[in-house]
Amino acid sequence: MLTDKTIIVSLTSRLFADEITKLQKKIGSILPLQDPHKLQSLDTLGLNAVCSRDVFPDYVHMFSYLSKCTLAILEEVNPDNLILTRLDPSETYQIKNVYEPMFQWDGFSNLTVIPPVFGRQQATVTLESNGFDLVFPSVVPSDLAQAIIGKLLLYNLYSRLVESDPEINIEEVNMYTTNVTHMGRHYVLDINHNNPNEALKSLDDLAVYTCILSALIPRACLRVLTILMRHDQHELLDVFRGIVPREVYEIDANALSIGDDITRMTTFITYLQSLSSIFNLGAKLHLSSYASETQTATCWISYC
């Protein structure tokens, strides 16, 4: 049934029978679109625009793309068009767990839409009839998505270290950065030949924010620890006060006026927020129910 959230993607040629079969197995999955318009062409659908088979994938760029594009559910496959439902906040939708590799969902899962970091080939349905690769994203638990972007940045960081220091063992770098573990299972990330451009820009930002925070943290730490001393404080505060370097306690907290002190604390909090923005994964899907027999979930979307 067509609604005001329906998006119709027109095809340039009729789909072959085997292509229809492959796409029907993907019904209920999430696909990104460049725009929210109701009528669109095939080249706006999926990740092919940022994940071409001819170039090394820039996964950080894809993360950014996914955080800005329109997300929709594949609802219907016809020989001449594809029907999708746009995901809007404050509405509930039905999606299906039809991704490779498949991660277990439950009725309380928070999911994140991420690039096909487990391999472009298994995330792609090639439509020879239209001369187009329809590249699907992966949908994984949000904590796993956080781990993946961390591994991706670390891989690009330590790959540069290997280039400058031949003593560093690349195999050891790969062992720690090119796989993730979830619920006791190991998954290999296809990041050995990724395009590092956007990852390095993110690492530049990380370095800048870390430098600024390193200058602000000692005084901020002292202020927070001393001001929060009280009868009903968190029981772990005493424990963690003991791991703070001695030189922090030697800072003269009264050397600045209260105005300058508050300004520094404001800057500290601002840059903490800026640092976290590097790892912002965009939209999240919150499940309210999941039926493992049909692999169908009811969810709503948020962008915070």
Curated annotation (Swiss-Prot):
Keywords linked to the UniProt accession: Capsid protein, Host nucleus, Virion
Superkingdom of origin organism: Viruses
Pfam name, any one: Herpes_V23
Molecular function via GO: structural molecule activity
InterPro entries: Herpes_capsid_2
Gene Ontology cellular-component terms listed: host cell nucleus; viral capsid
Subcellular location: Virion; Host nucleus
Complex and partners: Interacts with TRX1 and major capisd protein/MCP.
Family named by the database record: Belongs to the herpesviridae TRX2 protein family.
Function: Structural component of the T=16 icosahedral capsid. The capsid is composed of pentamers and hexamers of major capsid protein/MCP, which are linked together by heterotrimers called triplexes. These triplexes are formed by a single molecule of triplex protein 1/TRX1 and two copies of triplex protein 2/TRX2. Additionally, TRX1 is required for efficient transport of TRX2 to the nucleus, which is the site of capsid assembly.
Protein name: Triplex capsid protein 2
Native species: Saimiriine herpesvirus 2 (strain 11) (SaHV-2)
Gene: TRX2
